[in-house]
A protein has these predicted regions:
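Phosphate- and other anionic-substrate recognition elements at nucleic-acid/protein interfaces
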Residues: 1-19, 26-160
């Protein structure tokens, strides 16, 4: 498998859900789509201990949920340039592909944590509960933004 652009990624997804990963230094937020690829929902937060454990946890989700592809948040700088976090994200994706063959694509994650934080402020959750959910909510925001573009048939704009 390889890392695909958006159009080619969606051509590989047939009757499957997709997950989105928001990679952080300590945690990975995970969101999941419905099978119709319309809606994203926060799924869980995985604590990053070591790569082997992370792969095992992600593989378990992939197999349990019938996942056909993975979207990974692409951490561009606010001005749209790639920084060192893009390098580590790319390295993670390639390392994961060596362990598990599944279509992967990147999607712009700029402002996802801010959007997730703002959304969680609207809830009645306590601060610690919000912190536990933040990364998964950010992943769902990233995934929903891609699903919205996909469902509006505007993927070519992203691959421009």
């Amino acid at each position: 498998m390889t890392i695909y652009n958006h159009v080619n990624f969606f051509s590989k997804i047939v009757n499957n859900k997709i997950i989105c990963l928001d990679l952080g230094d300590k945690n990975i937020g995970v969101a999941i789509s419905d099978q119709g690829l319309k809606f994203a929902n926060p799924l869980k937060v995985i604590k990053r201990k070591n790569f082997k454990t992370t792969v095992e946890k992600l593989t378990s989700i992939i197999e349990l949920e019938n996942i056909g592809g993975i979207v990974i948040g692409w951490p561009l700088n606010i001005d749209g340039t790639q920084g060192p976090r893009c390098d580590s994200t790319r390295d993670f994706a390639h390392a994961f592909l060596r362990k598990y063959k599944i279509p992967i694509c990147f999607h712009d994650e700029r402002l996802s944590s801010i959007a997730a934080d703002n959304l969680l402020k609207e809830t009645n959750l306590k601060r610690k509960q919000k912190e536990k959910k933040l990364d998964a909510v950010a992943a769902s925001w990233i995934l929903q933004s891609l699903l919205d573009v996909y469902n509006n048939k505007n993927l070519e704009v992203l691959n421009g």
